Amino acid sequence: QANQDFMRF
């Protein structure tokens, strides 16, 4: 679930 990691911005 890298989506959440990308939304950390």
Curated annotation (Swiss-Prot):
* Domain of life assignment: Eukaryota
Q: Which residues carry this modification: Pyrrolidone carboxylic acid?
A: 1
Q: Report the locations given in the UniProt record.
A: Secreted
Keywords tagged on the record: Amidation, Neuropeptide, Pyrrolidone carboxylic acid, Secreted
Biological processes, Gene Ontology terms: neuropeptide signaling pathway
| Phenylalanine amide, modified sites | 9
Report, as the record phrases it, the tissue specificity of this protein. Answer: Detected in the thoracic perisympathetic organs in larvae, and the dorsal ganglionic sheath in adults (at protein level).
Any single Gene Ontology cellular-component annotation: extracellular region
Family as reported in the entry's similarity comment: Belongs to the FARP (FMRFamide related peptide) family.
This chain belongs to the protein called FMRFamide-7
